[in-house]
């Protein structure tokens, strides 16, 4: 049977569990995650990031005390200008 060669990708995705016992150090290699596990991990991470962004956004809106339509309009226009400036620089 042919063994899979280690590539930078497989080396980076390999889980390694290291434990110290006595004076020596023992390294135990666990199975490489399969593609479904990797996709699941990526989706969970992206969902956590998305939730954090939404929470931060709501906190910003809630931090405004009694926002008026005019103050909201100014805030949106400032964000729009900043966004357009970033588009031009990229």
Swiss-Prot record:
Please name the InterPro entries in this protein's record. Flu_proapoptotic_PB1-F2
- The name this protein goes by in its record: Protein PB1-F2
**Region feature (Disordered):** 1-34
Q: Which organism is it from?
A: Influenza A virus (strain A/Duck/Germany/1949 H10N7)
Cellular localization per UniProt: Host mitochondrion inner membrane; Host nucleus; Host cytoplasm, Host cytosol
State the organism's lineage: Viruses, Riboviria, Orthornavirae, Negarnaviricota, Polyploviricotina
State how it assembles.
Oligomer. Interacts with human SLC25A6/ANT3 and VDAC1. Interacts with host MAVS.
Q: What does this protein do?
A: Plays an important role in promoting lung pathology in both primary viral infection and secondary bacterial infection. Promotes alteration of mitochondrial morphology, dissipation of mitochondrial membrane potential, and cell death. Alternatively, inhibits the production of interferon in the infected cell at the level of host mitochondrial antiviral signaling MAVS. Its level of expression differs greatly depending on which cell type is infected, in a manner that is independent of the levels of expression of other viral proteins. Monocytic cells are more affected than epithelial cells.
The alphabetical list of record keywords is: Apoptosis, Host cytoplasm, Host membrane, Host mitochondrion, Host mitochondrion inner membrane, Host nucleus, Host-virus interaction, Inhibition of host innate immune response by virus, Inhibition of host MAVS by virus, Inhibition of host RLR pathway by virus, Membrane, Modulation of host cell apoptosis by virus, Viral immunoevasion
């Amino acid at each position: 049977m042919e063994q899979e060669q280690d590539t930078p990708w497989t080396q980076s995705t390999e889980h390694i569990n290291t434990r110290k016992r006595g004076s020596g150090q023992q390294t135990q290699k666990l199975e490489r995650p399969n593609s479904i596990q990797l996709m699941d991990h990526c989706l969970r991470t992206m969902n956590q990031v998305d939730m954090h962004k939404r929470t931060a956004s709501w906190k910003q809106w809630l931090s405004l005390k009694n926002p008026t339509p005019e103050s909201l309009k100014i805030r949106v226009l400032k964000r729009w200008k900043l966004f357009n400036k970033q588009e031009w620089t990229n």
